[in-house]
A protein has these predicted regions:
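ATP-binding N-terminal substructure of ATP-dependent carboxylate-amine bond-forming enzymes
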Residues: 1-87, 93-96, 114-117
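Short glycine-/small-residue-rich flexible loop motifs, especially phosphate/cofactor-binding loops
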Residues: 43, 95, 120, 232, ...
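Active-site nucleotide/adenylate-binding loops and adjacent lid/helix of ATP-dependent enzymes
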Residues: 64, 69-75, 79-229, 280-281
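Hydrophobic faces of well-ordered beta-strands that scaffold small-molecule active sites
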Residues: 132, 167, 299-301, 320
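A long amphipathic alpha-helix within ATP-dependent nucleotide-binding catalytic cores
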Residues: 163, 214-309
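Active-site "cap" helix and flanking loop/linker of ATP-utilizing ligase/carboxylase catalytic domains
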Residues: 203-242, 338-363
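C-terminal active-site "lid" helix and adjoining low-complexity regulatory extension at the edge
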Residues: 245, 265-281, 292-298, 305-363
Length: 363
């Protein structure tokens, strides 16, 4: 009876998801919605490099430089082999691989919709909050954060199961999200999803500061802030509560998610600040080591930390995910002709192909 009920709830969640996606109300922007953006990006990078750009299909392009050519499908390039791509997509396997090498990863458990007991037990041992996600996936699809009860575990598992039958539950890690781009073994760029911040005035409680800021937000037509779980969790790891009076001029983070209109389910990570120079050598080396362990020459290493200037072991931060074929639209300003990273990637691919061609001729 219980399994039948879960199956019906999963069916209802799937139909709702399809309706929201079809109607454009899901709040999700997928790669198919960025075809024109990536076409312009790769075209501009090819021209800057002195190459020829050709459209093979609406979402498939070719760049030639002399006798060397490469192709890309939206954000996907010719880096990495299928085995590496498959490994990187298996989150539990990556956690085990990185954890065994001494890198910081989240505490986690693997479970399925057919057997929720491991997830229930894990949540009970992490009452401050958990994250439930499909064991394979990208872009926040099927992910629910700040899970704090059995009912929420079940609901989050149903959503995650729409994307994969193997599921993960992880301890919620305090901090902000960072994406470190590793190209050919070297970290070349980093961005951060900065959460909204407020400044204390030495007289008002945080609760009062939020009320005042929401007045401004209403006047400006912005989404209001509220004291939800993300807010309370974020304040708590800074040693704050809604009733704390913060010293005048002291800034504090109010929440980890910068999209105040969305809550905990399928929140897209929108990086809004370049922080390459803020990442300490220890975290930089961790990201580069993660890429070597996965075997990827082009990897996005996702880190959660309170402070990128100190090692993860000091801040309690983690490497929470790795992404092959990392999306370059995270790594440039919209007003730029193309991300400098696109040029670096294109140069690297063409150079590798030229070397391979030369080796083939010599052989």
């Amino acid at each position: 009876m219980r399994r039948r009920l879960l199956a019906l709830q999963r069916l209802a969640a799937g139909l709702k998801k399809k309706w929201l996606d079809w109607s454009g109300r899901s709040g999700q922007t997928y790669f198919l919605d960025r075809v024109a953006e990536y076409r312009e990006m790769w075209h501009a990078a090819a021209i800057a490099l002195g190459g020829d750009f050709t459209s093979l299909a609406d979402d498939l392009w070719q760049v030639e430089l002399g006798s060397v050519r490469t192709r890309m499908h939206i954000h996907q390039t010719e880096f990495d082999n299928p085995a590496v791509l498959e490994l990187a997509g298996k989150k539990a396997a990556v956690h085990r691989l990185l954890g065994a090498a001494g890198l910081a990863v989240p505490r986690y458990a693997v479970f399925s919709l057919a057997d929720l007991e491991p997830a229930y037990l894990f949540q009970q041992s992490h009452p401050e909050g958990c994250v439930v996600k499909p064991a394979n996936g990208y872009g926040g699809q099927g992910v629910t954060t700040h899970v704090q009860s059995r009912t929420e575990v079940r609901k989050a598992a149903i959503l995650a199961s729409l994307y994969d039958m193997e599921l993960l539950i992880e301890a919620q890690v305090p901090g902000e999200s960072y994406r470190l781009l590793v190209l050919e073994g070297r970290m070349v760029h980093a961005v951060c999803r900065r959460g909204p911040r407020l400044k204390g005035d030495g007289a008002s409680t945080i609760r009062q500061l939020i009320v005042a800021d929401n007045t401004r937000r209403r006047e400006d037509g912005e989404s209001e802030l509220d004291m939800d779980r993300d807010c309370l969790f974020t304040l708590a790891y800074q040693g704050l509560t809604p009733d704390t009076i913060v010293d005048g001029g002291t800034s504090f983070i109010l929440r980890s998610v910068n999209d105040t209109a969305r809550k905990y389910a399928e929140v897209r990570t929108v990086y809004n600040e370049t922080v390459t120079g803020l990442v300490c050598d220890s975290i930089r080396h961790d990201a580069e080591r993660a890429a070597r362990l996965v075997g990827s020459d082009f990897l996005g290493v996702d880190v959660i930390t309170r402070d990128p200037a100190v090692p993860l072991q000091v801040s309690g931060g983690v490497i929470n995910e790795v992404n092959t074929t990392p999306a370059l639209h995270h790594h440039y300003e919209p007003r730029a002709r193309f991300p400098e990273m696109a040029l670096l990637v294109l140069k690297a691919i063409l150079r590798r192909k030229a070397v391979a061609m030369a080796a083939g001729k010599e052989g």
